[in-house]
Amino acid sequence: MKAFIVLVALACAAPAFGRTMDRCSLAREMSNLGVPRDQLARWACIAEHESSYRTGVVGPENYNGSNDYGIFQINDYYWCAPPSGRFSYNECGLSCNALLTDDITHSVRCAQKVLSQQGWSAWSTWHYCSGWLPSIDDCF
């Protein structure tokens, strides 16, 4: 009986753990948030390789004890405040949990800040996204 109650509780909580987007839904939402259209295919590629388009992903612990959060796998040592309270530069000025929600606004704004300060190579998956990319024109 306890196992059943736990399963029901987890099933009800599942929507709180983020959502899975696709290339086009991400491109449209980012466009609506003002991201330049010529960047959308590259962002979609990064999201695909970093999180498989999942907003609620917390990556495994990195070599320095940090973790990466959300659809763009943003690092908690530099960019957001981890729930553990561990030191962070928190350059985006937000909790890492804000990067795990269905609303990707915080993730997009923080990712844009990462891009402006470190460029595309800030993402370890960048090499998958540096050449030819599929067009996102069919998404609009």
Curated annotation (Swiss-Prot):
Top EC category: hydrolase
Keyword hit for Ribosomal protein: no
Gene3D superfamilies, per database record: 1.10.530.10
Any one Pfam family match given in the protein's UniProt record, by short name: Lys
SMART domains: LYZ1
Active site: 50, 68
Function in brief: Unlikely to play an active role in the humoral immune defense. May have a function in the digestion of bacteria in the food.
The name this protein goes by in its record: Lysozyme D
